[in-house]
């Protein structure tokens, strides 16, 4: 085998490896070996043993204070917002969000979207529209 043929075989091997590395993620390999999970980002003892609920940035409910009792929650619950996203969004991997995420508006998808997962939204109305007129309305959970 001459050096040019060997070079072509090596380039082809690199191209095949590059193509197949884009089709799979590392999550399947890492999950079987215990690399993710346990003390990872999505557990109650998350990033650095405690930056996610119930020990860190998720509120004061564990310390005896009710969440949003004084109308100081992250999501007010009323309003209108429009977000438009156009184009292809190739996303692969694991996403973990710790803390409070203010979500305002609605999400609308058009077209074919293949997705899996779960979303939980909880809070109280902090805009003065509660049953008492100053943000102490009934809590909601979606």
UniProtKB/Swiss-Prot annotation:
Record's protein name: Chorion class A protein Ld12
InterPro entries referenced in this protein's UniProt entry, alphabetically: Chorion
Keyword line: Repeat, Signal
Signal peptide: 1-18
GO cellular component, one term: egg chorion
Single GO term (MF): structural constituent of egg chorion
GO terms, biological process: chorion-containing eggshell formation
Function: This protein is one of many from the eggshell of the gypsy moth.
Membership in a protein family: Belongs to the chorion protein family.
Pfam families, alphabetized: Chorion_1
UniProt keyword annotation of Repeat present: yes
Keyword Membrane: no
């Amino acid at each position: 085998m001459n050096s040019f043929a060997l070079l072509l075989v090596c380039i082809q091997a690199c191209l095949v490896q590059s193509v197949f590395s884009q089709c799979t993620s590392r999550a399947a390999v890492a999950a079987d070996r215990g690399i993710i999970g346990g003390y990872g980002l999505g557990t109650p003892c998350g990033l650095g043993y405690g930056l996610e609920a119930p020990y860190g940035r998720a509120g004061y409910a564990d310390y005896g204070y009710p969440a949003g009792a004084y109308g100081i929650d992250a999501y007010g619950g009323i309003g209108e917002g429009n977000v438009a996203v156009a184009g292809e969004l190739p996303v692969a991997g694991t996403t973990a969000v710790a803390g409070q995420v203010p979500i305002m508006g609605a999400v609308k998808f058009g077209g074919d979207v293949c997705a899996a997962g779960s979303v939980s939204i909880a809070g109280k109305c902090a805009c003065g529209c509660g049953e008492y007129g100053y943000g102490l309305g009934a809590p909601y959970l979606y």
